[in-house]
Amino acid sequence: MKHVYNFSAGPAMMPKAVLAQAQQELLNWQQQGTSVMEVSHRSNAFMALATQTEQDLRQLYAIPDNYKVLFLQGGAHGQFAAIPMNLIGKKGKALYLISGHWSNRSAQEARNFCEVDQLNILTQDEAGVFSVNQTDFSDIAEQYDYVHYCPNETISGVEIPDIPIVGKAVLVADMSSNILSRNIDISKFGLIYAGAQKNLGPAGITIVIIRQDLIGNAQRATPSIWNYATQVNADSMINTPPTFAWYLCSLVFKHLRAAGGLASVEQRNQQKAALLYQYLDNSHFYHNYVAPQNRSLMNVTFTTNNDELNAKFVAEAAENGLHALKGHKVVGGMRASIYNAMPLDGVEALIEFMQKFAQENR
């Protein structure tokens, strides 16, 4: 079978070693004679897995003891609603920093539950190049119950590498597309959330890392499934959780730890992204419209000079085992999502095809 590299923005490529282990254990997990998909979430075996999964994530990120980790359902979209329901307090309003599609979507959902102020931090110059230059919001942040931002916008390929400065305000981050891609200081955040389907595992489970003092202030009408205090007290199992997705996350976390932790992960991600951006900048055939300081390590966007060539590129790339390179419908063009599981070989194969395509279509 032809080797395939999956550049999908999500659900995304998973580590081959993780998939191989899951395949090996599928019918007989921990010598129990059953699949992990069939094991009760209340069983001792699964409870031990859940505990170990949290411990592995805590070690990867050096999560402080005064933070709780939740494994929930509903994806990032669910958290768009859960966050204002749990964090809005006496100030009655939140600030959303808008850097693209997903930060805007989260702000629109939050408006159903609280007053929202939006601040557009994305700029575009005369050449059409996007950048984010403002990162200090300490002069306005403390009038809000929390400040929300999305450090990596998958659609446009814009990443904000510096953590926003918000003074004593609560900082909330949607890290769905760059969680575990590099090391960060968790203590600078009040809450981090992420859908699993890019760097953590398969779709179906959502990680929430929340500072303990922010728990217990949910609005009265908050459904129990979105109430962080209720979920903490129930060990994220107020209802039957997505056990197979949880299990796969556990394998991914162990895989990352065995591969050298987040320092090694970041080094590999920097290497992959640098190689691809360097080729784009020197190609004179493809174009990237993100300023170097804001180029995403995870989602590399590019385009040719016309839509017909873009469509031809995507089709021929797929024929050559390079899948899911079509850009999001909002922006068009192409997008190579090179999350943690994408090997360097995949990026090199993409560049080789890009060179060939450019030569044939100039």
From Swiss-Prot:
The keyword Transferase is assigned to this record: yes
Annotated residues for binding of L-glutamate: 42
Residues carrying N6-(pyridoxal phosphate)lysine: 198
InterPro entries (UniProt xref): Aminotrans_V_dom, Aminotrans_V_PyrdxlP_BS, Pser_aminoTfrase, PyrdxlP-dep_Trfase, PyrdxlP-dep_Trfase_major, PyrdxlP-dep_Trfase_small
Primary location recorded for the protein, binned into one broad class: cytoplasm
Binding residues for pyridoxal 5'-phosphate: 102, 154, 174, 197, 239-240
GO molecular function annotation: O-phospho-L-serine:2-oxoglutarate aminotransferase activity; pyridoxal phosphate binding
GO annotation terms (biological process): L-serine biosynthetic process; pyridoxine biosynthetic process
Family: Belongs to the class-V pyridoxal-phosphate-dependent aminotransferase family. SerC subfamily.
Pathway, per record: Amino-acid biosynthesis; L-serine biosynthesis; L-serine from 3-phospho-D-glycerate: step 2/3; Cofactor biosynthesis; pyridoxine 5'-phosphate biosynthesis; pyridoxine 5'-phosphate from D-erythrose 4-phosphate: step 3/5
Organism of provenance: Haemophilus ducreyi (strain 35000HP / ATCC 700724)
Cofactor note: Binds 1 pyridoxal phosphate per subunit.
UniProt keywords, alphabetically: Amino-acid biosynthesis, Aminotransferase, Cytoplasm, Pyridoxal phosphate, Pyridoxine biosynthesis, Serine biosynthesis, Transferase
Cofactor: pyridoxal 5'-phosphate
Name of the protein in its database record: Phosphoserine aminotransferase
SUPFAM superfamilies on file: PLP-dependent transferases (SSF53383)
Chain's role: Catalyzes the reversible conversion of 3-phosphohydroxypyruvate to phosphoserine and of 3-hydroxy-2-oxo-4-phosphonooxybutanoate to phosphohydroxythreonine.
Subunit structure comment from the entry: Homodimer.
GO annotations of cellular component type: cytoplasm
EC number(s) given by UniProt: 2.6.1.52
Gene3D superfamilies, alphabetized: Aspartate Aminotransferase, domain 1, Type I PLP-dependent aspartate aminotransferase-like (Major domain)
Compartment(s): Cytoplasm
Annotated catalysed reactions: O-phospho-L-serine + 2-oxoglutarate = 3-phosphooxypyruvate + L-glutamate; 4-(phosphooxy)-L-threonine + 2-oxoglutarate = (R)-3-hydroxy-2-oxo-4-phosphooxybutanoate + L-glutamate
